[in-house]
Amino acid sequence: MGFDEFQPGDKFHFDRSKLVMCLYFTFAEIDGASQGAAWFCPVAVRATEIDSVVGGWSRALACFLHRFFLGDHGAQTVGIPFTYQDRDFVIFAKLSNLVSDGDGFRKAVGWRGASSLRPSLVHGNVLKKDSDLFARRPGFVEIDCADPSLLHKTTTAEFQDSCDLVAEATQRYNHGDISKAMLDNIKKTEGLNYIPGGLCFDPRLRGLIEWFDAVTVDWMHTFLQEGVMNVEALLAIHAFVLDPNLFKAFLQDKPWNFPHAFQFKGQGLWRIFSATRLDDTGEVDKIRATASELLGLYSLLRHFLFTEVARPADLNANWLSFTACCDLLDYITDVKKKLVPMSHDMLCRKITIFMLAHVGCYGSQYVKPKHAWMWAVAERWLLDTDVWDAFIVERLHLRVKQIAAPLRSLHRLERTILSGVLNDQMRNLQTFHGACCLLGNSPFALSSLPDTLFGDEMHVLGMLLRVDDVVFHGDNAGLLKACVLEDGVLYGVVELWQPIGVVTPHAKRWHSQTGDVRLIDACEMDQAYNIGPIYLANRK
């Protein structure tokens, strides 16, 4: 389950009156949960309406969870009945993941946020930087901690005790028993605000819906949304005195060939270094990029620094810090695409390597609360079998956007949005075939192979692959020639290329048109992020 605010329109035409909080859910067992058609939108409510309710979004979320899981037709109590192919079924479900960004959790939980004394919702012994408190009492660390063994994950019981303390302190203050200063100190030390009827303070949910255990700090916001990679990329640009115009030309002028699914965004990455995103002097004072843009940029920045920029020995520590961050992001994306096993221990080792490299180079000056959130991302890997993130929530917002943007009247806005989203989803479900399926309206069969379907595009574990995309199979690169479905299994017809040289640890040169055509299981393939001149395949 994920939730986030969304404002229909564009960056030049803001309409605060249409700011909508949307909540989406899916079932983890659904094959193809990475596709939008598998996600449902039961809640879309204007922020202005939420703000008029005592308890705001926190109370609204608590009421929804109670009704959805514990109500008269609750998924956790009596189940959800349905009929399929003349057979009756009942689905029972409980909350496993609750995904949002930091601001979303602040509104939903009453958490005081990343700038508070306790900047981590998941680890209760992490304190803000330069608090001068962690050394006074054993068991506490600050956000620059690089040792996961020193972290303490807050239990549900401990969190509920903190909520009870804040609620009681608020009640005593209202009765005049304690001062405002004491109340503020209690809220500061617990890292929570009191929200009447809110998620933390609703007794109906306790012991029945373990929502705190379901809190999922996602890697997308942690690394790519004013996050860890934003900081690290900016520091690398400054350390190596990178000319933004030179890098913009590198992105703009070379004939990069991106996968069809990312072609539009990939070909526009140069805009990150255009004049409108730089400071008044034309320098890079901040990485102004969306999460998807930064995800496409970091590998190209690494390649550019490796091949086009001198790296003197005195900047070796800066280089190690940047590449360790890139390696960490490489690993997370590989796990998400199921190319490598999901390992909590491996993720923690990579976070430790990066944090030691970063703090060893820069100290704690540039460490942000989101550096501590990396450990919260790792905590979920002990419980989950898939990598859940907010990318799907951002994509689902597009479904809401196409319905809400043209609306001029606010009368019954929520009903209009929800009915439109439901109708759109019903149409999408007509072509939904799971995590791995052929796409498009014209798959065809050959007379010699009547039970085999061929197509130009397929969906594979969250990836959109299309004919003429460059793909990887292990360490081999090649060109996708056709998409094939046979006996319920997806394959790619791939012309493998011949490697002719290593450029960097992440890029090789290849000779194309080898004639070595093979049938490869689609689940074993990966996308090449970008292809440069002379068939330079840059995997990450």
Per-region residue spans from a language model:
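Charged (Asp/Glu and Lys/Arg) segments that form or flank catalytic channels of large polymer-
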Residues: M1-F6, L65, L70-E308, P312
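Structured nucleic-acid-interacting core domains from mobile-element enzymes and related host factors
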Residues: M1-S17
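E2/UBC-UEV (E2-variant) core
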Residues: R16-I80, K129-H175, K180-L183, E486-K540
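Compositionally biased, low-complexity linear motifs
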Residues: F14-F27, F134-G139, I403-Q425
